[in-house]
Amino acid sequence: MKKTAIAIAVALAGFATVAQAAPKDNTWYAGAKLGWSQYHDTGFIHNDGPTHENQLGAGAFGGYQVNPYVGFEMGYDWLGRMPYKGDNINGAYKAQGVQLTAKLGYPITDDLDVYTRLGGMVWRADTKSNVPGGPSTKDHDTGVSPVFAGGIEYAITPEIATRLEYQWTNNIGDANTIGTRPDNGLLSVGVSYRFGQQEAAPVVAPAPAPAPEVQTKHFTLKSDVLFNFNKSTLKPEGQQALDQLYSQLSNLDPKDGSVVVLGFTDRIGSDAYNQGLSEKRAQSVVDYLISKGIPSDKISARGMGESNPVTGNTCDNVKPRAALIDCLAPDRRVEIEVKGVKDVVTQPQA
């Protein structure tokens, strides 16, 4: 029977495949076990009756998992009370101990490990005997014995695991002191709780801020409304038109906004003259809007001369000067560009 028990332990420790069901690295666990305890090689001195070697065994244990393959375990075992009865003597033997072992495991699947435990047990063995019709005697002994165990462990959840284990303890007692020196095999089922197995909640990166949206607003004012022909001084009607424009610009209130005033002329006159006139008209508009409240560092003037005419070739065949001036009126204009970053409102995440 002893050889069979050792063979079972070795076989259980010898299985191997590829996944991991051990607790997470550097975590603790605790559990309890219950099972069948069997004493072997009892050899009671002077016993002439039956010995009840099969008893109930139990224990509690705690451990520390270093990595998926190595852990250390400490536990208490109650190996059971073994009575014996005879014609000449009656009595009982009981043993218990504290063990410390290294636990070596190997994964079979994601949820199943095989393992072996190797270490020692500090035990205490007690006996009580009496001769029918005579006095009873008690004695005890303590010592250290090697412990070998093998088993399989199944993770029901990341925190809870169950195990099936066979444990062998050699030579528990001193025959000269308590009358026997048995070995013990304990086949048990255990349940353990593993601490610290919960995965940390993933950190959700905040949604990136939306890219700023740049918006541009265009306004076009007729130069004939703002200025007299061939002049750069604002007319009263022109000031009224700019007052209305300023109100619209104030309502826009663009973030980090800027205003560019572009002056245009018609093609009548030289290029140089028209360029200068367009710059003066644009600057007149800028100066007026600054006087109304637009910051001077947010507004600029640019003369465009006779470039970008909107009339195209519509007036090519118009010869009388007065008629040509009227025909080219759309080219004489002031354009205003307002650029700014539009605020993007994002909804809070639930």
From Swiss-Prot:
Principal location class: membrane
Site, as annotated: Part of salt bridge gating mechanism: E73, R163
Chain's role: With TolR probably plays a role in maintaining the position of the peptidoglycan cell wall in the periplasm. Acts as a porin with low permeability that allows slow penetration of small solutes; an internal gate slows down solute passage.
Name of the gene this protein is made from: ompA
Entries under PROSITE patterns matching the protein: OMPA_1, OMPA_2
Subunit structure: Monomer and homodimer.
Keyword field: Cell outer membrane, Conjugation, Disulfide bond, Ion transport, Membrane, Porin, Repeat, Signal, Transmembrane, Transmembrane beta strand, Transport
Disulfide bonds listed in the record: C315-C327
Family: Belongs to the outer membrane OOP (TC 1.B.6) superfamily. OmpA family.
Name the record gives this protein: Outer membrane protein A
Molecular function terms from GO: porin activity
Domain OmpA-like stretches: 214-342
